């Protein structure tokens, strides 16, 4: 079956996490992603956080599935010639270099457009135009500057970054959407264009409910936040609110049976108004259904600490899965806190391809995240990540059409090998 992006060729100059997240998603949908890497070195994540000596790390393998790898010294004259030919043959160039790197490489936007007017150049940067645009950004920096950290954590504690990589992977997903949108527009315009996703912008987009709450503050306290019920005044910025629900329905993380020894024996519980009476029955407080102090959502807001303490008395008598089963029967919103171990072993996630097993020639079998987006007419399969330069000759021949003699000349030029160090005199 033909995949959604079959026929689209991506020139992938990305590294670490944000860019590879984008290009891996495109590869899962069928694009031919050619990962350009430095000879002898490759993507820096090949050697980062290695759990097995002398093999590609999981950091690399889990972000570079379904790609082909070519090594190329873009400072070498012959390497520049090869890159020029690749630009002619590809639809999209994706990069997450620091500002100005493509220009210094000798391939600014204007030159790329001369070489291939239909090429889309997609970039991830830390910040958009402004006072910070030249600053280096990593995952946690993006979370801190995009509004996530200042609104995550508990009111009396430090700002916190999340375990989810919303800065890197989140921005990569934003860029992928930008690329397919530009590809669609090209079917009408016949022209390429630049696509940019800034990490600060991506994090803010994912934290939009907090920007919503910032504006609500001008009209009064945020009543669904715990501190309202505790009588603590609000300041001029959205506060950290612990595990309060962000959707207007009060919610908390509560202890379950076994919490003393199991760090993940917890459940998230939402006191949604339409099921309040069912909640009262489940926890053994039927009088709360008619008591004016508890019957209506507005009356409950100042008493949330008391209410959740009572609910927790009930959840502590059940495992998180027992509690979930009971609550789901009454459509009471909840969710167990699942550890990564539990997720890795979840057979339903295996069945849907969200968690997959991959066999790698040097590190053996490992599990990874598959495509989280399912298309009924474009199934995704997860193929192992490439070894460094594994497809160099294949790409030179099958994509660029070089003859054996031309390929040999390129090898002799040093364009595909690490630069030779000058011997000391």
UniProtKB/Swiss-Prot annotation:
Domain of life: Bacteria
Positions of CoA binding: 17-18, 38, 72-75, 96-98, 104, 136-139
Alphabetical list of InterPro entries matching this protein: CoA-transferase_III_domain (IPR050483), CoA-Trfase_fam_III (IPR003673), CoA-Trfase_III_dom3_sf (IPR044855), CoA-Trfase_III_dom_1_sf (IPR023606), Formyl_CoA_transfer (IPR017659)
Pfam families associated with the record: CoA_transf_3 (PF02515)
Record-level GO BP terms: oxalate catabolic process
Keyword Transferase included in the entry's annotation: yes
Catalytic residue positions: 168 (nucleophile)
Molecular function GO terms recorded: CoA-transferase activity; formyl-CoA transferase activity
Annotated EC: 2.8.3.16
Subunit details: Homodimer.
Protein name, entry field: Formyl-CoA:oxalate CoA-transferase
Organism: Bradyrhizobium diazoefficiens (strain JCM 10833 / BCRC 13528 / IAM 13628 / NBRC 14792 / USDA 110)
Lineage of origin: Bacteria, Pseudomonadati, Pseudomonadota, Alphaproteobacteria, Hyphomicrobiales
Gene: frc
């Amino acid at each position: 079956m033909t995949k959604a992006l079959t026929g689209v060729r991506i020139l992938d100059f990305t590294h670490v996490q944000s860019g590879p997240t984008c290009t891996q998603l495109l590869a899962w949908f069928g694009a031919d992603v050619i990962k350009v890497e430095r000879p002898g070195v490759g993507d820096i994540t090949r050697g980062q956080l290695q759990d097995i000596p002398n093999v590609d790390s999981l950091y690399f393998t889990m972000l570079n599935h379904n790609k082909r790898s070519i090594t190329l010294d873009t400072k070498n004259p012959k390497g520049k010639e090869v890159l020029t030919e690749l630009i002619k043959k590809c639809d999209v160039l994706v990069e997450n270099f620091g500002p100005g790197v493509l220009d210094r490489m000798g391939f600014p936007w204007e030159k790329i457009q001369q070489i291939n007017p239909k090429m889309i150049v997609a970039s991830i940067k830390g910040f958009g135009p402004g006072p910070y645009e030249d600053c280096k950004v990593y995952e946690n920096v993006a979370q801190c500057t995009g509004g996530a950290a200042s609104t995550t954590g508990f009111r009396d504690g430090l700002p916190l970054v999340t375990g989810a990589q919303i800065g890197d992977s989140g921005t990569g997903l934003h860029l992928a959407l930008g690329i397919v949108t530009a590809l669609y527009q090209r079917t009408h315009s016949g022209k390429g264009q630049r696509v940019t996703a800034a990490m600060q912008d991506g994090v803010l987009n994912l934290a939009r409910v907090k920007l919503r709450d910032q504006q609500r503050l001008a009209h009064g306290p945020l009543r669904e936040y715990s501190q309202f019920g505790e009588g603590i005044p609000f300041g001029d910025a959205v506060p950290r609110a612990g595990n309060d629900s962000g959707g207007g329905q009060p919610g908390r993380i509560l202890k379950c049976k076994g919490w003393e020894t199991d760090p993940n024996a917890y459940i998230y519980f939402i006191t949604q108004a339409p099921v309040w009476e069912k909640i009262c029955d489940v926890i053994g407080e039927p009088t709360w259904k008619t008591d004016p102090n508890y019957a209506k959502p507005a009356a409950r807001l100042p008493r949330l600490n008391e209410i959740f303490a009572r609910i927790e008395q009930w959840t502590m008598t059940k495992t998180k899965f027992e509690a979930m089963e009971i609550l789901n029967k009454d459509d009471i919103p909840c969710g167990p806190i699942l550890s990564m171990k539990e997720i890795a072993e979840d057979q339903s996630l295996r069945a849907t391809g969200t968690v997959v097993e991959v066999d790698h020639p040097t590190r053996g079998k490992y599990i990874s995240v598959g495509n989280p987006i399912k298309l009924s007419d474009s199934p995704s399969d997860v193929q192992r990540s490439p070894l460094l330069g594994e497809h160099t000759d294949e790409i030179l021949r099958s994509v660029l059409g070089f003859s054996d003699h031309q390929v040999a000349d390129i090898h002799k030029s040093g364009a595909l090998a690490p630069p030779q160090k000058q011997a000391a005199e």
